[in-house]
A protein has these predicted regions:
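Histidine-rich, glycine-flanked metal-binding segment
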Residues: 1-57
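Divalent metal-coordination and catalytic microenvironments
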Residues: 11, 26, 31, 52, ...
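C-terminal cap of metal-dependent C-N hydrolases
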Residues: 11, 363-415
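Metal-associated gating/positioning segment near the N- to mid-region
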Residues: 41-42, 50-111
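Active-site mouth loops of central-metabolism enzymes
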Residues: 62-73, 131-145, 169, 204-207
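Metal-cofactor-binding active-site regions of metalloenzymes
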Residues: 85-91, 95-96, 111-139, 162-169
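His/Asp/Glu-enriched, well-ordered alpha-helical/loop segment
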Residues: 275-371
Length: 417
């Protein structure tokens, strides 16, 4: 019998794609999962003690901003968001565009330890400084023909199209750009991913558009498989209407028309809104962290005035596992939360035959988490504080069979209540 490269021993293995949830061992050989079961008598080059550790399919963060330097301070180091945070795959949401996808391929996809994919921006400038300059994102800032061509040429890394539906843009150019984004997505048979919640100031503060009306215009454009982001946003124009209820048209889209929901946590998350949306029966399909340079603290960077005044600034500490912990705290069961970062994102990417599972023969992409018990403080960016009793923290990951420690400075310190 061939000697294994690595045995991950004694962890609680949870894989929603196969239904497994038990304490067992995983064997890795030549970068792939070769065995699952009692491997205590198997010879291996290395052993990883996973006692009291959750062993999951490699986690997939469906909403990252990792096009470092090209998108200014907005883009983070992909490996600090990825493998060194226990995450094996990160999807950059709208950072690269038809003009900058080549750089994304060369500097991220080909060189990062983390698997880096993207939803290409519908806009020519991509995610420049996190869309800080609204005038760059109007009808004159899109070129559907060019974006369609470039997306088709890069389908190995382009897995969707990113656009925005929010009242700042609506006040300037209506929903024309959203229609163009849908045109691009449909032409390349990829999902359209729509940001909800106000980003930009309205053009004329005396004539604030009706955020509820925008939702009514948006939803008919969405097809099964398209995605709505930020269901728990504290900003106007999200899932909750001006009366404080979840939009009926959004409930219909999610429950009956196959539209998917991504958490897109970021600095948008509100406990109050999250409870309203979850109580209405909307359970997100995927859980993207939405970390970027203005909502996490990077110790090596100066906390300058420009950063502090940025409209996308967030102060509540979070990462993917904190976002997972918040959903657990709000009553979503562990298996469903794990599905949101494993098998479900793999389906979004149309890569369920490669990612999101611990099936034998798959790439050895494996995330390791610690479930800590106690009393911990969770904070949102509206100032809300809640106490949870279970906190998920990254312990590391294996990517293609290689181990990475969860030593990213972006991993928040736990706050004991």
């Amino acid at each position: 019998m061939m000697k294994l490269d690595t045995v991950i021993a004694g962890g609680r293995v949870i894989d929603p794609s196969t239904g497994i949830d038990e304490c067992t061992d995983i064997g890795i050989l030549e970068g792939k999962i070769s065995e699952i079961g009692d491997l205590s008598k198997r010879e291996a080059a290395s052993y990883f003690d996973a006692t009291e550790t959750l062993v999951l399919p490699g986690m997939i963060d469906t909403h990252g901003h990792i096009y470092q330097h090209v998108t200014g301070k907005f883009g983070l180091d992909p490996d600090l968001v990825g493998v060194h945070s226990g995450v094996t795959t990160v999807i950059d949401q709208g950072g690269p565009s038809c003009m900058t996808i080549g750089g994304f391929r060369h500097y991220l996809y080909e060189k990062s330890k983390t698997r880096t994919l993207c939803f290409i921006s519908a806009y020519l400038v991509g995610g420049l400084e996190g869309h800080l300059y609204p005038d760059l994102y109007g009808p004159c800032g899109v070129n559907p023909e060019h974006t369609i061509r470039v997306a088709r040429e890069n389908l190995d890394i382009v897995k969707g199209v990113k656009a925005h539906a929010e009242i700042g843009g609506q006040s300037r150019w209506g929903i024309e750009v959203i229609r163009t984004g849908k045109e691009i997505a449909k032409a390349v048979d990829l999902p359209l991913y729509i940001h909800l919640g106000q980003l930009w100031p309205t053009k004329d503060s005396a004539e604030i558009p009706d955020a509820d009306e925008l939702i009514e215009k948006l939803v008919p454009l969405m097809d099964p498989g398209d995605m709505l982001a930020h269901p728990f946003t504290r900003h106007p124009g999200g899932f909750v209407n001006q009366r404080g209820d979840v939009h009926p048209i959004l409930l219909e889209a999610v429950h009956n028309n196959g539209v998917r929901v991504d958490v897109g946590h970021g600095s948008h998350f509100s406990f109050d809104v999250a409870r309203r949306v979850l109580d209405a029966g909307v359970v997100p399909f995927t859980l993207g962290a939405d970390m970027h340079g203005y909502n996490v603290s990077v110790p090596s960077e100066e906390d300058d005035e420009a950063r502090k005044s940025n409209p996308f600034l967030g102060v509540a500490p979070f990462n993917l596992t904190i976002a997972m912990s918040e959903l657990l705290h709000l009553g979503v069961d562990l298996k469903s939360v794990i599905s949101m970062v494993t098998e479900n994102p793999a389906k979004v990417l149309k890569m369920e035959d490669e990612l999101g599972s611990l099936k034998l023969g798959r790439k050895a992409d494996i995330s390791l988490l610690k479930m800590e018990n106690g009393r911990f403080t969770l904070t949102d960016n509206s100032g809300g504080k809640e106490t949870c009793e279970k906190l998920l923290m990254p312990a590391g990951c294996f990517k293609d069979g290689n181990f990475f420690e969860a030593n990213s400075p972006l991993v928040p310190e736990k706050i004991v209540a």
